[in-house]
Design a protein with these regions (language model features):
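FNR-like FAD-binding dehydrogenase module
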Residues: 1-630
Length: 630
């Protein structure tokens, strides 16, 4: 039976930017394991086209980023797949299934998934079932379409690849063995003396995470120069203007993003250690060791930056690498059910894994934003074996923020060797009270709010999806960025000013750049208003239109401004070859702005509704309508 099973090999691949597609891939991997496939999970960039043909089936999960682009960790794979040297039919021995993660508030919904799917078909690969697609705007989120699709996938896998005679799928109530387990680094479990320090009470102020730098692939060291609150203390939201100096010279353009890697706070880590009864071993050096399940697999380590030689402690893992404050997924409850001796707790945990109780799961987790730590505090009978913690608690991922400045090198001071690159961010600190009257804080923004001048942290810099180039300088831009969506617009305004100084263009633009902004109050969260006025007074070809939704009885939003100034927008776009940029919250805002644009095109272009929509689609196809929302 072992030989027969080894012939049923599944390769699960993902292209992910925020981690959602990776979560989906790992769940698909568990499904395949339960059907007794020898399963490997990896990012798309980690495999060659040749490897696609070395597995019985390839299962793909991919999200769409930017303007219908593939995530960075899949672009090398996509480049290889698009090679003109590949002949039609070269992948005819490949069987696959794919699931896309998208957002219907974007014009190019699930575009990356569809491009990848169609290219695989073009090269001869054959799907074993219909492709699946999720919508971020679905009331039930990803699960709304993922759960039905996985049922179809399971049936297709069993039909195409029947289990060896005498074998049955691994039941859902049987725990899958992780590929890697934690073990003591030394037989005597020597306590750590150089890792994260033990935490304790710090009097009136909350103790902050340690300042040790993290080892991240492509990681850069950034020094905090300022972390200023822009909104008054009386305002409901704390919004920060964070300024960082990054070691070295790093070119970036408007729309690019900086990823900050947060840490959990000592108070939460201590609570987790305490409820799991891990205090005696929390600071002992540990390492990862392969389990029996990884004998025939090239499984990656639970912490991507680790090697088999790396050592750590439970406290370090919980501080730097495990997301103990994230909202748990269904699979988390299934795993917890194995680690309780309380029958009531076990039954309740298993209820949350049943698709019939999806509304109850939503009401328990997503609606009140209940965290993993809080779940464990409520199900106090659950005791996770420390050896398996990395297979149960999800990885703590970096958070991306659109850069709010143009690229500027900072002259090194006598105390600093080498060049530094200034990067500024506009960040809304997530802190609110839930329906169950508990204070919630964003993991990343709570960490960011704690940063102090001269503190160092690890960041990475990556390309965004706006595609701004200097060649567009002779065209006006229409920038629509309410709230913190103004961050990349500020970068764009600054960058265009820099480019004009560096390379004066002979033909001055015949239309001003237009910036549309909205917030709640003119005196509370009108970000960079003095800066806009200074630019305009100095002759920068810029007009700024701002709306304040709470300063009068009738609420005014950014789409209302677009309607009011639709003549200028149409002239800039239709007559001056202008480019439209939209940034900010996903969901209703981009759709409302899109509708306002279409109505303006109808009015000033004397177009029918159908022709106005076609005009907007043409702008998208030509790269003159670009959206980056989150």
């Amino acid at each position: 039976m072992g030989d027969l099973q080894s012939l049923r090999r599944a390769l699960v691949l993902y292209g992910s930017e925020t981690g959602n597609a990776q979560d989906v891939a790992e769940e698909i991997g568990r499904l395949a394991e339960r059907l007794r496939f020898d399963t490997e999970v990896a990012e798309l960039n980690a495999v060659s086209l040749k490897q696609l043909l070395q597995h019985d089936v390839v299962l793909i999960s991919i999200s769409t980023t930017g303007q219908g682009d593939l995530p960075p960790n899949s672009q090398a794979f996509w480049k290889a797949l698009r090679s003109a040297r590949l002949r039609p039919g070269c992948l005819q021995r490949m069987r696959f299934a794919s699931f896309g993660l998208g957002d219907t508030s974007y014009p190019k919904y699930n575009w990356a998934h569809r491009k990848l799917y169609n290219r695989l078909i073009q090269l001869g690969a054959r799907p074993i079932c219909d492709r699946g697609e999720s919508d971020e705007q679905h009331p039930e989120g990803i699960d709304g379409s993922f759960l039905p699709w996985t049922a179809t996938l399971r049936n297709s896998l069993l039909q195409e690849y029947p289990l060896p005679e005498g074998s049955e799928p691994i039941p859902d109530n049987v725990l899958l063995e992780p590929k890697w387990l934690l073990d003591f680094a030394d037989s005597n479990g020597i306590a750590s003396t150089n890792g994260t320090a033990k935490s304790g009470s710090n009097g009136d102020t909350e103790e902050r995470p340690d300042q040790a730098l993290l080892e991240i692939p492509g990681g850069l060291t950034a020094n905090v120069t300022s972390n200023d609150r822009l909104t008054p203390m009386t305002h409901w939201q704390d919004v920060r203007h964070l300024s960082l100096d990054v070691e070295g010279s790093h070119a970036y353009v408007p729309g690019d993003v900086l990823t900050i890697y947060p840490k959990n706070f000592p108070t939460d880590v201590d609570q987790f250690i305490s409820i799991m009864d891990w205090t005696p071993i929390a600071d002992q050096r540990m390492k990862f060791a392969p389990s029996s399940a990884s004998v025939s697999s090239t499984a990656r380590l639970p912490v991507p930056t680790f090697t088999v030689e790396s050592t750590t402690t439970l406290r370090e893992l919980l501080t730097n690498h495990l997301d103990i404050l994230s909202i748990p997924r269904r699979s988390f409850f299934a795993k917890l059910a194995h680690y309780t001796s309380d029958e009531f707790h076990r039954d309740r945990l298993l209820e949350f894994t049943d698709p019939e109780y999806i509304d109850e799961l939503f009401d328990y987790t997503t609606r009140p934003r209940r965290s993993i730590l809080e779940v464990l505090q409520e199900f106090e009978s659950v005791k996770i074996p420390w050896q398996r913690v990395c297979s149960i608690i999800p990885t703590l991922r970096g958070r991306q923020f659109s850069i709010a400045s143009a690229m500027t090198e900072v002259s090194p001071s006598p105390a600093v060797k080498g060049a530094r690159t200034r990067i500024e961010l506009l960040i809304a600190i997530v802190k609110y009270k839930t329906v169950i009257k508990r204070i919630r804080q964003g993991v990343a923004t709570r960490y960011i709010a704690s940063l102090t001048p001269n503190q160092q942290l690890t960041v990475t810099l990556s390309r965004g999806g706006l595609g701004v180039t200097q060649n567009e300088l002779n065209r006006p831009v229409v920038m629509i960025g309410p709230g913190t969506g103004v961050a990349p617009m500020r970068a764009l305004v600054q960058q265009r000013i820099q480019w004009r100084h560096q390379t004066p263009i002979p033909d001055t633009p015949t239309a001003n750049d237009l910036l549309f902004f909205s917030c709640r109050n003119a005196e509370s969260d009108y970000f960079f208003k003095d800066e806009w006025r200074k630019h305009i007074d100095s002759g920068v070809p810029l007009e700024v239109f701002a709306a304040f939704s709470r300063d009068q009885r009738q609420k005014v939003y950014v789409q209302d401004l677009v309607r009011q100034q639709s003549g200028k927008v149409y002239d800039a776009v239709a007559n001056k070859s202008g480019i439209i940029y939209i940034c900010g919250s996903s969901g209703k805002m981009p759709q409302a702005v899109r509708e306002a644009l279409i109505e303006g095109f109808q009015e000033h272009g004397e177009l029918s509704r159908e022709d106005a929509e076609a005009f907007l689609v043409a702008l998208e196809k030509s790269g003159r309508y670009r959206q980056e929302t989150w």
